[in-house]
Amino acid sequence: MSKNDFNATINLPKTDFPMRAGLAKREPDMLRRWNDMDLYNEMLKKNDGKPRFSLHDGPPFSNGNIHMGHALNKALKDFIVRSYAMRGYYTPYIPGWDNHGMPIESAIIKEQKLNHKAMSIADFRSACHDYAQKYIDRQMDGFKRMGVVADWEHPYKTMNKGFEADRSEERR
């Protein structure tokens, strides 16, 4: 029996899926396709006017690259938001970042070896702002690469002027 005869006796499913994943090659095209189809806004449009489900994002600090804890956190939130969207809820999801406090200050002092005591408060705050924005951009890119569907164009950042005033107004 030749090899070709034997192959004809095996009943394998027919599929368009490639035999090799080739993720490094295919990932940019997948991400571009999801971006081009505006997946987040399409999901919102589909359920516009229906009951609302809001998941408030407890934000990560913007003081380093994403790690497994961030990945698990965002994957679970994405799963919850998508499952509510599939159940017919309007599900806006606004990602955010916490940019205040010691985690940012400690990270920038350590990483850039800053002598913050020799700097003016304004210069140190500006350096912290730039440092935080760098890691927001990196983390956002990582979350997008994970396929997290969110309003990436309008995230909240605790370092933005007016953020705290806006939160105070919401609580009234």
Mark where each language-model region is:
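N-terminal, positively charged nucleic-acid-binding surface of large information/translation enzymes
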Residues: 1-172
